[in-house]
Amino acid sequence: MLDKNTNLTHQSKIEFVNSNLRGIGFVNNTKIEVPYSLPGDVYNVTFFKKKRRKPSAKLELVSQTQRSFIPPCSAFTKCGGCCAQHISYQDQFRYKTSSLLESYKKDFEIVPTLYPAQKTFYYRNRMDFAVFPGPIVGQREAGSFRHIVDLETCLIQSKESNEELYRFRNLISKFPNLPYDRKSDSGFLKYFTLRKAKNTSELMTILTFVEEFKNTIEEKEFENVCLKSLKADHILFCFNRRKGEISATGEIKILKGMDSYKELVCGKEFRVPFDSFFQPNPEGFQPILDFIEKEIPDSFDHLVDLFCGSGFFSRIFAHKFLKITGIDSIESSLEIARKQMSLDFPKIDSSYLKVDLFSKHSSSKLKVLFSSSDKDVLIADPPRAGLGEFVLDALKDSKVSYFFYVSCNPTSQKSDLWKLKDFFQIQKILITDPYPQTPHLESVAFLKRKNFTT
């Protein structure tokens, strides 16, 4: 318990680093999380409480244990992007996975396979930089949405993207009145987005403006300068609400190239629309795909692709099936899936259905789908929150024989697997790390229905 006098200062020593890559210390029985810290660091901790809010803590560094690893980025601890450049990658991966490893051993008597990152920098295929008056171009400040840290380069995006960022910074310096001022509600340019394919050479640059900039003399002048200065294969202007803080969304104008870029995954071509989600690190995600390819059993007819998006998994593994059913809630993504599947695999019986899997109305449709055959293989790649109660309930009564559960949040994944433990047996689990310098992981669990016999 905290002292009644919340203004008292206490001293706390960091004891360990948790899976979120934050140092953990204690004041009496109260846990303190400290970013950018390591075991042995000592802090003065002063608690304070605002009305109707939980107590907060002010931290003051007293002493710091010797660092053996120097962060390569000068903006580290100021920029809100990376959180672990002060930790060697080997230790990062150990911190991120150790608690998961132990909990799977304890709760499921299974040892996950761990696959660390092969590339720890220059791996992301998309970065969104806010543009503020100054001009300032950068990422949100750690712990603050109102301020950004000016960045000349970013070590987790590609070198080609950094070259384009350099060109843009030189360009925008000649237009000091163009950046949108959130305080005075003046100016036009809000975001600068870079999307660089990993397995092709294509680069896309997207500039997001307020709607009022469209069809102005200033827009035409800036368009001409962009075409002369920027080198991306695809250059787009995007226009959306003045008060909206969303990048690369809205009405577009194509200055150069197309509104999508080409990426290759497992030898298959994907057209990635300017405003759509795609795996941030396709190279780092490849172990997940290799795992599924190896474990998919032979002689199964039907693939069910839940949370299918634009049909990423369907297209990669379609050659193993006679029929594919994809389900998602976003019609624009489903249209892409239908079009690409009909082009790539015209002889496969494929259908992509619009269903909100987090709505109770999905229950009846899922139960019909999951009870159709013993020859079904399921791949599900849900959002961070997990499968949701309606998918879980449908799976408990299903005839699905084999189930691949892909997750960007292994913690919620493990919680879902515990709820399914009486119905499915975990065969194998792979945990991999496409996102070094951050606390995020990707994992895939391969499950077999308990009452299924081959």
UniProtKB/Swiss-Prot annotation:
GO terms for biological process: rRNA base methylation. Keywords: 4Fe-4S, Iron, Iron-sulfur, Metal-binding, Methyltransferase, S-adenosyl-L-methionine, Transferase. The keyword Ion transport does not apply. CDD domains: AdoMet_MTases. GO terms for cellular component: membrane. S-adenosyl-L-methionine binds at Q279, F307, D328, D381. Its EC number is 2.1.1.-. [4Fe-4S] cluster binds at C73, C79, C82, C154. InterPro entries: MeTrfase_TrmA_AS, NA-bd_OB-fold, PDGF/VEGF_dom, SAM-dependent_MTases_sf, U5_MeTrfase_fam. It comes from the Bacteria. GO terms for molecular function: 4 iron, 4 sulfur cluster binding; growth factor activity; metal ion binding; rRNA (uridine-C5-)-methyltransferase activity. The active site is at C408. Belongs to the class I-like SAM-binding methyltransferase superfamily. RNA M5U methyltransferase family. PANTHER family: RNA M5U METHYLTRANSFERASE (PTHR11061), TRNA (URACIL(54)-C(5))-METHYLTRANSFERASE (PTHR11061:SF30). This is Uncharacterized RNA methyltransferase LIC_11085.
